[in-house]
């Protein structure tokens, strides 16, 4: 680095440390504003640097016409780059010199600027956006003339008569240099629906969208992509009324609808306007799928160039960049390549993990970007339309969003910055809390935006709260009116009837004689766990019930991160990724091991075990029943039951030693419970990379003594991997690790149902049975002892008669024949010796109508003198049917023999009436009865339009074309793209030969 730059840097640090730098009174840009021309060169002296600037004529700014844009370099500094924006005498600039970045910004004081060096640091992982399945290859669009898909906008789109020439009007040919595209222009239309305006406000939403898209521009201009791409906002649509475009809950239908909307807007543009290359539709509504959805490779087309994104705060910029990349043709990382970069959170990873300080494009994305860029013919030149150009620099935002506004944007209504927890720096991470629960703070693990106010005359710069230019650190002046907290009120009653619940208390903030909700620092309410006084009876697992309500095959899933323990997470029995269904109800235990920790508004409130609670204090004196069992099982080719663990078992440990690889499964002893295979919920680990010793359980040692043997040779040295996993079943969390020779299954909390352990060989083609050893150890609470009770042992002899009344002898046995009572007799079999048929109630009819309905009843042979009123008495006194007469009462009779109503039935849609072009498809109606009069009046058949491929035209096939097409890119289009684009006359003119060849192939296909 030259010596003059060192001097400049030294002076720079001195200026930054001393405060703001005041430029000369004369304008920094030498040419007055009204006399600027694109070919003129401007010089700006900045400390020891000489900035050579040139106005960028291609940049248009209809929304902020008072701004002008310049680009250039620092003289005598190789590889330098400068971007400067002037808005009413205020300068915003980004300087890249010697591998470092410097930001030039105005202060709040007029005619004062500050220059800062950016030291970008890496932040922690951000919130996750799972975008798996966020793409579609083709869309099913049907453009009917009577469709009304253009709702009235308060930022009106431009309309004109329909013209097919507008999309290719004044299109200049562009030949891509061999070294790559030198510059790309991606012109965008941004649509914000009524949910965006309702949340952000009509005036504020414009600034918010520009700030959001500035972040997107910075992502695309990151050095890891090497794109040299410029984003231009060509059109901004704001809809105040609820639109009819989005199909809420069906993201694919919504994507098809907005692409149809986009097509109609492009077709209605005035002649001479090229429109835009892609459209971003922003909404805060639930999409019913990923946070974004886009057609792959749809840019530069009219029918597939729109993407939909859900606004979840400024971090949604990474989702927008992700979907824009899909429109450009980029695919997900990890789909065959760049798996490691996807796991680190690249922009095109299926699960996006990124922050404003930590994002990068993978090598696969970079390779795809530059390989596909030659096909983006619409991006090779800037149009003549007006638009807001986004430079991609990471300078501080021009529009200041306070921390409260950022919290509301990220988490929703009612959220503001958390004030109940003291943090070292408010700029290191954005913490937010809801006004109903101010003591519970949440974060998406990202810092506030650059330039966010963090105190009086202070703002956030590189995650540090620093004084604004022109201000130094000020000491706080003692205020006579200091807000003060009042005393805490009494705790509320425990909200649980049994077990553990929650109680709350509040305090009020007093300021200037009034009660204030925000003047005092700290929390105005507290929540704590409480003991209701008695344990609850055996209850069901609420997590299992909630997952079962969503789908019968779902079981609970417990995240490794404790901060997510109060979320309803479920996973399929057959494995796969967990799905989140919101927060658990208040009062639900946070985990299975600590039932005294209780969930409240999605956050776990820690508690303590009550000494009288038998759920957690189940072994108070240390004397518990320890159960140890060993088994040897012979395995065949099917599932074999290894053992059955009873409910109420705690501290469970199972060890299975096997000579062959096994599949292990768990099954609750309940009806209709599917088998849970451990292999479907396991992860593979490389043993050679692990340095842990493995626990070898000795079944002869009671587990409650917690004695284990450390043995590093328990695994066969030939094995190179093992499997680990966990799952929730039988109301407890089970963990396991498995190799080809050993399986360990453990659980600490109580089993709510009996649990069956089963095994099957991995390769079930055994000729001989294989012997497998299993040891099971668990503990149960010691039952209460009862006082000794001594009773006589009574024996009854046989009855002297089988019916009609008899007697039998009763004798008593006692110890050593002492104090034995004398024998006695009792009557027996007093029922009559005559038996009759008794009938039960008629059952329900087998049909509600028709000619086949029958109903049945059950017959019993019972004594004639028995008085029985219930079915239970019939069964108790019934005897063999041979004791009754052969003439039985009827046990079956016809019922509901009435005609059934019949209705007209719709048949499947008929094929299209035309083999090509437009036609009609109908849905016939049939009457299932023999006479159509029984079905009533025949309703009108439903009809719909259908359209197949365009009918081939002999005139088009025979059309005369020049020797070569006018445009070099015609040969790059696929056959499907040619079928669509050749409908536009200007395109057919430029690509005459390509369109004629496509018509001939289609003519041969249909001919």
Swiss-Prot record:
Recorded E.C. number(s)? 3.4.24.-
For this protein, the record's PANTHER family field holds: A DISINTEGRIN AND METALLOPROTEINASE WITH THROMBOSPONDIN MOTIFS 2-LIKE PROTEIN, ADAMTS A DISINTEGRIN AND METALLOPROTEASE WITH THROMBOSPONDIN MOTIFS PROTEASE
Q: Which residues form the Peptidase M12B domain?
A: 184-370
Q: What is this protein called?
A: A disintegrin and metalloproteinase with thrombospondin motifs 1
Q: Which residues form the signal peptide?
A: 1-20
The molecular function terms in GO held by this entry are: metalloendopeptidase activity; zinc ion binding
What species does this protein belong to?
Bombyx mori (Silk moth)
**Reported cofactor(s):** Zn(2+)
């Amino acid at each position: 680095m030259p010596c003059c730059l060192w001097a400049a840097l030294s002076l720079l640090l001195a200026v930054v440390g001393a405060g703001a730098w005041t430029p000369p009174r004369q304008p920094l840009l030498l040419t007055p504003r009204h006399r600027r021309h694109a070919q003129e060169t401007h010089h700006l002296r900045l400390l020891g640097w000489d900035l050579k600037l040139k106005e960028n004529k291609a940049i248009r700014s209809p929304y902020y016409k008072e701004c002008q844009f310049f680009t250039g370099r620092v003289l005598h500094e190789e590889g330098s780059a400068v971007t400067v924006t002037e808005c009413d005498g205020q300068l915003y600039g980004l300087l890249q010199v010697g591998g470092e970045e410097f930001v030039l910004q105005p202060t709040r004081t007029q005619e004062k600027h500050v220059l800062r060096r950016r030291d970008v640091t890496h932040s922690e992982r951000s919130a996750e956006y799972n975008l798996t399945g966020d793409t579609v290859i083709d869309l099913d669009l049907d453009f009917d003339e009577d469709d009304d898909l253009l709702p009235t906008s308060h930022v009106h789109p431009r309309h004109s008569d329909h013209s097919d020439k507008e999309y290719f009007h004044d299109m200049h040919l562009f030949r891509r240099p061999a070294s790559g595209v030198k510059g790309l222009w991606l012109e965008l239309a941004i649509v914000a629906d009524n949910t965006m305006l309702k949340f952000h406000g009509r005036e504020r939403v414009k600034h918010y969208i520009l700030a959001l898209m500035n972040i997107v521009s910075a992502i695309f201009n990151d050095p890891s992509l090497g794109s040299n791409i410029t984003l231009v906002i060509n059109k901004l649509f704001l809809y105040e009324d609820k639109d009819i475009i989005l199909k809420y809950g069906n993201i694919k239908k919504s994507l098809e609808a907005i692409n149809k909307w986009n097509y109609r807007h492009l077709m209605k543009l005035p002649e001479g306007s090229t429109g835009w290359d892609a459209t971003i539709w922003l909404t805060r509504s639930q999409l019913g799928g990923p946070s974004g959805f886009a057609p792959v490779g749809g840019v530069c087309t009219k029918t597939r160039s729109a993407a939909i994104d859900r606004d979840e705060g400024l971090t949604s910029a990474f989702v927008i960049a992700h979907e824009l990349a899909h429109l450009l043709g980029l695919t997900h990382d990890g789909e065959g390549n760049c798996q490691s970069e996807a796991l680190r959170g690249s922009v095109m990873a299926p699960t996006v993990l990124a922050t404003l300080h930590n994002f990068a494009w993978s090598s696969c994305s970079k390779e795809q970007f530059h390989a596909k860029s030659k096909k983006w013919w619409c991006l090779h030149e800037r149009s003549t339309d007006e638009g807001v150009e986004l430079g991609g620099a990471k300078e501080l935002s021009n529009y200041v969003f306070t921390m409260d506004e950022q919290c509301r944007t990220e988490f929703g209504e009612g959220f503001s910055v958390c004030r109940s927890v003291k943090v070292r720096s408010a700029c290191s991470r954005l913490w937010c809390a809801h006004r109903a629960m101010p003591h519970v703070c949440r974060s998406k693990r990202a810092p506030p935006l650059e330039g966010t106010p963090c105190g009086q005359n202070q703002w956030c710069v590189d995650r540090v709260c620093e004084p604004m230019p022109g201000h130094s650190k000020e000491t706080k002046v003692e205020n006579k009116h200091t807000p003060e907290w009042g005393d805490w009120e009494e705790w509320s009653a425990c909200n649980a009837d049994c077990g553990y619940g929650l109680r709350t208390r509040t305090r009020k903030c007093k300021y200037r004689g009034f009660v204030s909700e925000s003047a005092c620092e700290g929390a105005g309410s507290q929540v704590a766990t409480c003991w209701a006084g008695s344990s609850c009876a055996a209850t069901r697992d609420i997590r299992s019930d909630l997952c079962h309500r969503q789908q019968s095959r779902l079981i609970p899933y417990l995240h490794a991160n404790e901060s997510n323990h109060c979320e309803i997470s479920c996973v399929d029995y057959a494995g796969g990724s967990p799905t989140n269904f919101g927060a658990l109800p208040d009062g639900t235990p946070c985990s299975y091991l600590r039932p005294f920790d209780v969930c409240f508004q999605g956050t776990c409130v820690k508690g303590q075990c009550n000494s009288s609670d038998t759920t957690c204090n189940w072994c108070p004196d240390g004397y518990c029943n320890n159960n140890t069992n060993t088994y040897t099982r012979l395995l065949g080719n099917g599932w074999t039951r290894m053992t059955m663990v009873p409910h109420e078992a705690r501290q469970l440990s199972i060890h299975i030693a096997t000579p062959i690889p096994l599949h292990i499964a768990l099954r609750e002893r309940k009806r209709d419970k599917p088998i849970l295979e451990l292999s479907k919920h396991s992860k593979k680990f490389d043993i050679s990379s692990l340095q842990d010793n493995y626990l070898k359980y000795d079944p002869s040692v009671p587990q409650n003594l917690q004695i284990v043997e450390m043995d590093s040779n328990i695994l066969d040295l030939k094995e190179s991997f093992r499997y680990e996993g966990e799952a929730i079943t039988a109301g407890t969390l089970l963990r396991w690790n498995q190799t080809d020779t050993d399986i360990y299954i453990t659980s600490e909390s109580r089993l709510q149902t009996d649990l069956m352990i089963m095994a099957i060989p991995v390769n079930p083609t055994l000729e001989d049975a294989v012997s497998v050893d299993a040891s099971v150890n668990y503990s149960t609470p010691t039952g209460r002892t009862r006082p000794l009770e001594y009773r006589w042992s009574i024996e009854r002899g046989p009855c002297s008669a089988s019916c009609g009344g008899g007697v039998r002898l009763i004798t008593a046995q006692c110890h050593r024949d002492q104090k034995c009572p004398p024998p006695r007799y009792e009557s027996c079999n007093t029922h009559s010796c005559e038996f009759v048929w008794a009938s039960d109630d008629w059952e329900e009819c087998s049909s509600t109508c028709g000619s086949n309905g029958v109903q049945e009843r059950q017959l019993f042979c019972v004594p004639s003198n028995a008085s029985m009123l219930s079915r239970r008495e019939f069964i108790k006194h019934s005897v063999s049917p041979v004791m009754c007469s052969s003439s039985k009462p009827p046990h079956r009779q016809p019922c509901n023999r009435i005609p059934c109503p019949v209705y007209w039935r719709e048949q499947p849609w008929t094929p299209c009436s035309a083999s090509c072009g437009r036609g009609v498809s109908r849905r016939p109606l049939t009457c299932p009865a023999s006479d159509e009069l029984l079905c009533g009046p025949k309703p009108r058949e439903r009809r719909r339009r259908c359209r197949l491929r365009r009918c081939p035209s002999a005139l088009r096939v025979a059309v005369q074309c020049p020797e070569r097409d006018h445009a070099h890119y015609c040969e790059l289009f696929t056959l499907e793209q040619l079928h669509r684009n050749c409908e536009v006359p200007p395109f057919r003119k430029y690509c005459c030969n390509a369109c004629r060849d496509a018509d001939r192939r289609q003519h041969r296909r249909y001919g």
